[in-house]
């Protein structure tokens, strides 16, 4: 959700902080602020809205020369997105500043107690209790000791950073169920919510774990647990290319990431296809799947849609009963679980608060855990032990595209691996699907090369459109859901996805000439039925757009426009049918002049429950 960044070293901190916040914009935010410590004490600048507003305010004041600083982009949870609620927040003296990503669940109780002690509050945020708590414990103690004494009173999930004009040669960071990475430099050190903020400055990083804090100086990073005990931790080398966080000539990151999907599929498949004795190489323990009775998949948002496809694949290919649950509901309506149950957590970032909380609850009940994530070093990776790395690379656009495709590929590999272990599919059928997977990148490149200009022109026709409906059947029903989600996320057009057969059970009442219907109709066992459902919409004057092959006469006759896809084995079609829907959503939103990469109210990594 929120983005936090910090610097301590010999340089002026301000340029690093501003650049770092820009690299965290993809996380979503509604205000921003910076605090630096220098010879004149603590300097604080905050602004509502985008970072350019903060930069304008910074340009209007004397530039800070402080060499220690923290920065924050806020996604509002407690208190409206106003400047007085923006971080950093200070204590009564104005000499100690705090930023936080997360939620302090017991803030109301703490706030009441602090008010009784005479503390005055200037915001409605939960974070403001933290600097006051620290200040109350500073007398006769080090900054680290005061922070630790305050942290043990907090309940919730949070990452915190603290600077003080009275301790100008250090800063303190704390992690409890919210992401925080520390970067190691030469004569300087850094921290951030995520790697993109620091990847241009260092390749040596350390991911802070839950229940840990760190004291950063120019020359040292000390790691402690919440009791104050010193811990030994070793930085790891970061294998990242800084160009991943650049647009490289594309208008938006989202468009760049759509075009990166062929390469992502190749990377996700690389070295994972074996021979007849072991056609899939996922590096997972054989015990994970022994005597397996049932699978539950937990996810949120786009990952939930990928999981619906995964359910279909696992049941179709491996014959294992599989259910997909919203992570936010799983803990409160827990299904029957036992030692022969596998729970799969799916999260692009590996830091999704609801997903990790659900996995933690499932783990306590003795189930087997597997993670599917783009960030194996994340909290999810540490929690599950066994995981499939989707290898999609950094995704900056808030609306997931290439990470969705990579999750689909991961589910294909998992389902085929289970089918091989259980003997539910012939070796020939498994090889047939694997060959088809390997051909998909070139087919997607063909879609991108031939359809971009056409979809750009098609988007012009929806300037005044207020509603869309997407329909599909079978394993393309989740793609209809994903197409609707992409459109509503970035264009702010109301869009819904339905099983095509459900149109006549209610949604058909919404149809008229002003409501376009996008139908996914590819040759296979539900092709004719999907076309029949599309005809029902056409009879109500709805404009029909088909995601279908161009060389199918029935499709050409049915649809007003076609977003063409190649004919492939039906089981492989979701990876192809989603691409035109991503392009359609992108070009409609871009034509409307919207912020495609940072849609309003959304965050890339939803770290709070």
Swiss-Prot record:
It catalyses: D-fructose 6-phosphate + L-glutamine = D-glucosamine 6-phosphate + L-glutamate. GO terms for biological process: carbohydrate metabolic process; fructose 6-phosphate metabolic process; protein N-linked glycosylation; UDP-N-acetylglucosamine metabolic process. Keywords: Aminotransferase, Cytoplasm, Glutamine amidotransferase, Repeat, Transferase. Residues 285-424, 458-599 form the SIS domain. Pfam families: GATase_6, SIS. One of its GO terms (molecular function) is carbohydrate derivative binding. The keyword Cytoplasm applies. Signal peptide: none annotated. Residues 2-219 form the Glutamine amidotransferase type-2 domain. It is found in: Cytoplasm. It comes from the Bacteria. Catalyzes the first step in hexosamine metabolism, converting fructose-6P into glucosamine-6P using glutamine as a nitrogen source. Homodimer. This is Glutamine--fructose-6-phosphate aminotransferase [isomerizing]. It comes from Gloeobacter violaceus (strain ATCC 29082 / PCC 7421). The lineage of its organism: Bacteria, Bacillati, Cyanobacteriota, Cyanophyceae, Gloeobacterales. The gene is glmS.
